[in-house]
């Protein structure tokens, strides 16, 4: 298989070698452990046939902020989370496929120069600070977008989304139900955070705004006591004074 995984144990990436697999991971998981996810990767490998659907089902079951790369002698898989909080880059310019967590490594491997610049992407960066879609500043280098994965197998690379954020799809329901759903989602997120804290202190940069107030209120609702709120700025400023009242 002509796949080239250019990964290094740096910037938080860790490599695990099991059952002839190279498994790279960065980030953290919710509701499961890394050992369980590695076992899922082994199970996927031992089934023999890996399909886009089987990878999609696997990816949909993962929660947290993470990215992973899985390589065997027959296939390569790369997955980013629903936010793409940790980037992964790929290219098919040369024979086979290249995957890396660090775009400059692909740039060097492909020996790209200014003739390969994607000027549409450059315009997007100049106007907004980032590119749109899977583009990068160089034409041959692409990136996995939020909620997507790639599968390289039988000398073919396929990219697919396992999750699409579609807020424009409205669902008619009552205001009461919407409030209930929002409360349930918010408290579940906070429960995940409490589990990840594992008893450690939660430090909240508290202001007069609703965002930090929501976090403080939810931790209070869930009876998490190891909380410290901080504010900053000029003495007596409105934000700090209001935050003090909220904290008390």
For each of these PLM feature ranges, what is it?
Residues 1-248:
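Cysteine-centered catalytic environments shared across enzyme families
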């Amino acid at each position: 298989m002509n796949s080239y995984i250019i990964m290094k144990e740096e910037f938080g990436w860790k490599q695990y070698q099991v059952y002839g697999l190279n498994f790279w991971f960065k980030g953290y998981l919710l509701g499961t452990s890394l050992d369980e996810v590695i076992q899922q990767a082994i199970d996927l490998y031992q089934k023999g046939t890996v399909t886009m659907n089987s990878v999609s089902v696997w990816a949909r079951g993962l929660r947290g902020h993470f990215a992973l790369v899985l390589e065997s002698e027959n296939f390569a898989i790369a997955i980013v989370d629903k936010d793409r909080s940790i980037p992964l880059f790929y290219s098919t310019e040369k024979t086979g496929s290249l995957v890396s967590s660090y775009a400059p490594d692909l740039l060097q491997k492909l020996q790209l120069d200014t003739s390969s610049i994607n000027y549409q992407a450059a315009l997007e960066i100049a106007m907004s600070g980032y590119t749109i879609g899977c583009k990068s500043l160089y034409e041959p280098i692409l990136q996995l977008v939020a909620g997507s994965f790639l599968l390289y197998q039988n000398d073919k690379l396929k990219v697919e989304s396992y999750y699409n954020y579609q807020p424009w799809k409205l669902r008619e329901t009552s205001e009461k139900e919407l409030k209930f759903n929002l409360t349930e989602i918010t408290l579940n997120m906070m429960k995940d955070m409490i589990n990840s804290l594992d008893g450690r202190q939660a430090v909240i940069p508290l202001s007069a705004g609703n965002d930090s107030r929501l976090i403080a209120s939810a931790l209070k609702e869930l009876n998490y006591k190891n909380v410290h709120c901080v504010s900053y700025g000029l003495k007596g400023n409105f934000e700090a004074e209001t935050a003090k009242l909220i904290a008390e």
